């Protein structure tokens, strides 16, 4: 059972060890399928994260300035409020880990959880309530659409975190059905075409 030597998480490890005693071959196959599907999903989520991150950054560079992340945590910055304090701290922490960080460095260092957070009501409103413009759907009923996107994005984030922590994905009952590619396709194509001319560094995913 060499595959048990890898870091698969305590939940998986206990199940695999118990089942392997009874059904060694079948258990091995199930675990391999789980890992293969987890890897496939992880690659899809990585691609989605890059697409969403770059679209948000391009949008806010147009509206808030080329260095909007640094500006957002200054004395009069959009995130320097009680409601957005946690977002401000995330940017400060990311900045403190990089020597003389550029805007691109900060963008690359922030993970999907940060970009999803920007759709929360306080962060969304602090930046001018324009972030849904990165998507192509009808922009009527702004509040309902924002809430719907928060739900969908958090499901994708939850799946990302389960995979990152080596938890069950394929064989976990009650896992939500996610349409990652559908959400990705909803990002405005005109903006994605512009992004090709102003491509941020494609790094920073953990």
Report the location of each language-model feature.
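Amphipathic alpha-helical interface elements
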Residues: 1-206
